[in-house]
Amino acid sequence: AVGFAVENPKAEIFAFDVNEKALIVARQLAQKNDVEERVKFHVNFDEHSLKGILSRHNGSRTFIFMDVEGAEEHLLNPTVNPAVLNCDVLVELHDCFKPGITEKIIDYFHRSHKVEIIVDYDGRQKASSLNYFDISEPDWRFCTDESRPAKMRWLRALR
């Protein structure tokens, strides 16, 4: 969230995390980067939170960046929240937890958006080739691998 705010100085950012300790660190990071006025941090998130944000920003350019461990099927459902169809979306897909979720999310957006699937690199071992810092292999793996049972995919849906 803080990185988005730094890179998009006119954007208002709404950030949610279930981990309150992570939110404390994120707030500190926002202060250190002078973006705390534009990043609103919240611990609870559900379809009502999303509806509220989208209703207040109806008509403005809105980008949803979402990683919600399988809840994307419900949160991005246009039947639950039609306003999502007015947004650009980047969402991590969690077929490893909910098989078939990718096809459902594609179905939500393919008529109104240009949809693209981004596939995780083939094998977590490739992460070591991206280690630009002097960090041991086990520490680098700890920082970059979520220990998922399969490659992860992201869906990008642009209007």
Predicted regions, residues:
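Conserved SAM-binding loop of SAM-dependent methyltransferases across substrates and taxa
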Residues: A1-K10
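Proline-centered flexible-loop/turn and helix-kink motifs
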Residues: P9, V35, L85, R111-K114
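Residues at the starts of beta-strands that form the adenosine-phosphate
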Residues: E12, R38, D88
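Hydrophobic/aromatic beta-strand patches that form the interior of the parallel beta-sheet core
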Residues: F14-F16, H42, L90, E116
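S-adenosyl-L-methionine
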Residues: F16-E73
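A short alpha/beta connector and helix-capping loop motif
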Residues: T62, H74-I105
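Rossmann-like AdoMet/SAM-dependent catalytic core
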Residues: C96-R159
